[in-house]
């Protein structure tokens, strides 16, 4: 009995990027191994996959064509100019289909960001993988296809549809965060150029404003005077007495390298101070800062005697002690959602901005569009309603809405300023009154807010500059938006949840460190689940849906540890996937939900 082959669906969207203006279709891609990468530029897991794909693009050259299918979550991501900026910002060096209506997403039955689909040179789907961490599996599939279709004569290894746009000439390119230095200068992470820039003034358009550069500007990892970074973001100034002891003044969140770097301002020397360079996959128990794996550190702040790290890649805050040389989790469980409480129990979703104010630490949680506060060992949400609710609404904090904020700062009057990135605004929260207002709007993806020289300075990332905007407090009601996707009908009461997983060929489950399976279940709203929430070690679980809740989103995080079965020195692998499954609770709905974790 032969297995039927599935013809790949056509690529349909609003337009194309990185093709020199040409529209692509599968007929033009015939003869190539094609990998469709369904992504959205807000999603940290999608950004991880972009970096997993880079070595495959280099290895297989023109025999392989990666096609990014951009299927957006937030309203801002539907803007074609915002997508074009993101493609440049993150160094996407392959064609990208703009799929704002999720047409191609639906045609391939994608259910999660990111999803990868492999198409053979004859136009048939051969593999689908959801989530990140599939580089080795992709390498094996692509290698087999290249070998087999070379033998068949159906592989075209020459020519590429990718056409690079010429680089723009600006003093900064997609700056991320800024830091006021003693003496009045500003230090800025020039993220898309993989370097730090020291500015003598706020407007860097004039060459005279650039007082110095740290880093060669090449994407990479190198210490010393000729340092290299990889899309650096956050900056934190150490207290003078700490800096003297450790030999560096500033801690840098070197995001894509999964490192923290130390910078000595006197001569620009860079040192790696935390991280191995490998992306965090599971807790190894290590405490020495240079022995622990990090995951996309996005911001850093000095608070309570240490550097707090917004570990966006695993939805946690970490604590780095530069004197002791230790690092580890400080808040969060790695579950991506919104839950308050003691620091060890809270849930976050891509924390991306930090600001200390005495005994309080403020943070913005990008994927829940939330402003949150840490105080007295607990975290509470001030603004934000969950993973799928966002907008631009001022008023009482409980009713206010933001859209994917990336930066936060404390104003001289004690209020909190938020870089409300996808709304293009600076928002103000007054802890005394509990009110949220808009200070400035019409900005191009503001990513940080600081106070320097008595002025509020905004990193206007997509405009490639720093600005000190005129701040005119106003109330805005831009509406409430909710992410909508295809929904699954489930029956009330007990529901059987099953995660299907089979180790890849040549691998087996790895029991070396306990159970190789971990499954965490939560819901938005939390009231959707009467029982069955939390972490467990089984792939099958009975959960119970609460009476009186019409629906919501079931959030499932599953991971499986495997190792090579026969190798003398077996490599270890961790497969992880997050699902957000929108459900409606109806009488005739399904009583079982099955999700596939692909290795």
Regions found by a protein language model. Name each.
Residues 84-119:
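Short, internal strand/loop/helix patches
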Residues 47-89, 100-104:
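Structural microenvironment flanking redox-active thiols in thiol-disulfide oxidoreductases
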Residues 181, 186-192, 245-256, 264, ...:
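Conserved beta-strand positions in repeat-built beta-propeller and related beta-rich domains
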Residues 38-55, 508-509:
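Conserved redox-active cysteine motifs that mediate thiol-disulfide chemistry
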Residues 1-26:
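N-terminal "domain-start" segment that seeds a small globular fold
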Residues 156-176, 202-234, 269-296, 324-350, ...:
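Gly/Pro-rich loop segments of beta-rich domains
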Residues 120-182, 474, 480:
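Thiol-/selenol-based redox modules, centered on thioredoxin-like
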Residues 404, 471-599:
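Extracellular/lumen-exposed scaffold segments
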């Amino acid at each position: 009995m032969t297995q039927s082959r599935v013809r790949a669906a056509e690529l349909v969207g609003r337009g194309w990027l990185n093709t020199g203006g040409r529209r692509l279709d599968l007929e033009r891609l015939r003869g190539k191994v094609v990998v469709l990468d369904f992504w959205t530029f807000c999603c940290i897991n999608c950004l991880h996959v972009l970096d997993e794909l880079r070595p495959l693009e280099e290895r297989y050259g023109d025999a392989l064509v990666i096609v990014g299918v951009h299927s957006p979550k937030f309203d801002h991501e539907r803007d074609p100019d915002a997508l074009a900026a993101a493609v440049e910002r993150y160094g996407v060096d392959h064609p990208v289909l703009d799929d704002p209506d999720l047409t191609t997403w639906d045609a391939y039955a994608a259910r999660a960001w990111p999803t990868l689909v492999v198409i053979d040179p004859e136009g048939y789907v051969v593999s689908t993988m959801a989530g990140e961490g599939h580089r080795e599996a992709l390498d094996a599939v692509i290698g087999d296809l290249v070998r087999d279709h070379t033998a068949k004569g159906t592989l075209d290894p020459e020519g590429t549809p990718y056409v690079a746009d010429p680089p723009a000439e600006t003093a900064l390119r997609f700056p991320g965060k800024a830091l006021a230095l003693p003496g009045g200068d500003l230090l800025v992470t020039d993220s898309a150029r993989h370097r730090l820039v020291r500015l003598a003034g706020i407007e860097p358009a004039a060459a005279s404003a650039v007082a110095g550069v740290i880093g060669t500007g090449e994407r990479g990892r190198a210490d010393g005077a000729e340092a290299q970074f990889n899309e650096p973001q956050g900056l934190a100034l150490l207290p003078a007495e700490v800096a003297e002891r450790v030999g560096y003044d500033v801690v840098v969140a070197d995001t894509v390298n999964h490192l923290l770097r130390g910078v000595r301002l006197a001569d620009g020397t860079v040192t790696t101070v935390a991280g191995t360079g490998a992306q965090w996959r599971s807790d190894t128990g290590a405490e020495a800062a240079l022995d622990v794996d990090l995951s996309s550190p996005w911001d850093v702040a000095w608070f309570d005697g240490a550097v707090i790290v917004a570990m966006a890649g695993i939805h946690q805050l970490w604590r780095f002690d530069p004197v002791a040389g230790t690092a580890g989790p400080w808040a969060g469980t790695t579950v991506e959602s919104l839950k308050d409480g003691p620091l060890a129990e809270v849930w976050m979703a891509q924390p991306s901005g930090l600001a200390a104010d005495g005994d309080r630490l403020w943070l913005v949680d990008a994927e829940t569009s939330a402003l949150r506060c840490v105080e007295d060992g607990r975290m509470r949400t001030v603004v934000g309603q969950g993973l799928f609710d966002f907008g631009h609404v001022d008023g009482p904090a409980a009713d206010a809405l933001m859209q994917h904020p990336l930066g936060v700062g404390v104003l001289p009057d004690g209020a909190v300023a938020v870089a409300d990135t996808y709304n293009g605004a600076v928002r103000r929260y007054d802890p005394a009154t509990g009110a949220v207002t808009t200070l400035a709007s019409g900005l191009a993806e503001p990513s940080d807010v600081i106070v320097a020289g008595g002025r509020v300075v905004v990193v206007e990332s997509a405009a490639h500059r720093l600005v000190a905007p005129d701040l005119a407090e106003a109330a805005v009601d831009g509406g409430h938006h909710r992410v909508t996707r295809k929904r699954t009908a489930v029956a009330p009461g007990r529901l059987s949840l099953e995660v299907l997983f089979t180790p890849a060929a040549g691998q087996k489950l790895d029991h070396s460190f306990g159970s190789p399976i971990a499954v965490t279940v939560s819901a938005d709203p939390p009231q959707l689940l009467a029982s069955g929430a939390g972490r467990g070690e089984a792939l099958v679980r009975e959960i119970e849906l609460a009476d009186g809740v019409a629906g919501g989103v079931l959030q499932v995080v599953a991971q499986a540890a495997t190792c090579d079965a026969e190798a003398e020195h077996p490599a270890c692998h961790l497969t992880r996937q997050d699902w957000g499954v929108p459900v409606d609770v109806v009488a005739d709905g399904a009583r079982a939900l099955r999700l596939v974790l692909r290795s």
